[in-house]
Amino acid sequence: MRVLGIETSCDETGVAVYDTEKGLLAHQLYSQVKLHADYGGVVPELASRDHVRKTLPLIKAALKEAGISHQQLDGIAYTMGPGLVGALLVGACIGRSLAFGWNLPAVGVHHMEGHLLAPMLEENQPEFPFVALLVSGGHTQLVQVKGIGDYHLLGESVDDAAGEAFDKTAKLMGLDYPGGPRLAALAEQGNSDRFTFPRPMTDRPGLNFSFSGLKTSAANTLAANDSDEQTLADIARAFEDAVVDTLVIKCRRALKETGYKRLVVAGGVSANKHLRAKLEALLEKQKGQIFYPRTEFCTDNGAMIALAGALRLEAGEREPLAVKTHPRWPMTDLKPMVNISDAV
């Protein structure tokens, strides 16, 4: 099955073509970082309007890259949620309209399921069951995964997501948007021994997270010290260490509670080199396996939507003609899949 995937949930326009026999045929991505930079964050109205301008040209480019015409597609998948409602509507309306005009089946995909399945775009694919750490600007969750659509939430952030905490702290430090990657880059120059921040909620049972207090700790430390480059780097390092250690501690607990030996890490923060190194060390110590997508598929992209959509379309799922979006959509609301082929 050959599927066109469309991702427009936030500030990236992603389009891809995925073939269940040949793998990824095309991948086109446009980032709105420059558009939102002057505002220090995503402006929903501007994001929606830019998706309107960019989605159709990217679809044409993806089909050209794949070397196919729309007549050679077998289905269309689009992000149905969660995300910014206006941005979601752009992708959903375009995807559903093209499916109707081209007489193709369509399916709406859960954005976070796309992230969770993104490692299946790689040659080294995880087998079920596994624990998934989904860590991004909007979500920080630990999920027990028994199969596609068979998800049990083990823990999540009770306030800020990890990526959100990175971005907010970077803004406090005066770093340009997008702040998270810039803070991580600055942290590489920092001394890990100068400052120490707490590891929130690791002193009690459970798998939930809390990162808003770390932002407060960083703000207090910034206010009490000089703002020279080395001090900022040291604070960035202490902040990153605290976030990464917290994530690693919770992953260790989740693996112990489930008895699983496989960990999938996905979402924008999964590209963090410090996080990857510490999680790899954890899984090596436990004689387990860790899986994550290549860096370009850690952030939002159309490839993960095309893959997830292809699996659901092959299993017989179809969307009605009505265009629906779910700006808020718990992943645990999804139903377990049946009749999944060996497409991946």
Curated annotation (Swiss-Prot):
Binding site for Fe cation: 111, 115, 300
Co-factor requirement: Fe(2+)
SUPFAM superfamilies according to UniProt: Actin-like ATPase domain
A GO BP entry: tRNA threonylcarbamoyladenosine modification
Presence of keyword Transferase: yes
PROSITE patterns: GLYCOPROTEASE
Principal location: cytoplasm
EC number: 2.3.1.234
Disulfide bonds: none
Molecular function in Gene Ontology: iron ion binding; N(6)-L-threonylcarbamoyladenine synthase activity
Cellular component aspect of the GO annotation: cytoplasm
A Pfam family that the UniProt record links to this protein: TsaD
Subcellular location: Cytoplasm
The organism's place on the tree of life at top rank: Bacteria
Keywords tagged on the record: Acyltransferase, Cytoplasm, Iron, Metal-binding, Transferase, tRNA processing
Catalytic activity: L-threonylcarbamoyladenylate + adenosine(37) in tRNA = N(6)-L-threonylcarbamoyladenosine(37) in tRNA + AMP + H(+)
Residues where substrate binds: 134-138, 167, 180, 272
Record text on cofactor binding: Binds 1 Fe(2+) ion per subunit.
Role description: Required for the formation of a threonylcarbamoyl group on adenosine at position 37 (t(6)A37) in tRNAs that read codons beginning with adenine. Is involved in the transfer of the threonylcarbamoyl moiety of threonylcarbamoyl-AMP (TC-AMP) to the N6 group of A37, together with TsaE and TsaB. TsaD likely plays a direct catalytic role in this reaction.
NCBIfam families in UniProt: gcp_kae1, T6A_TsaD_YgjD
Family: Belongs to the KAE1 / TsaD family.
Descriptive protein name: tRNA N6-adenosine threonylcarbamoyltransferase
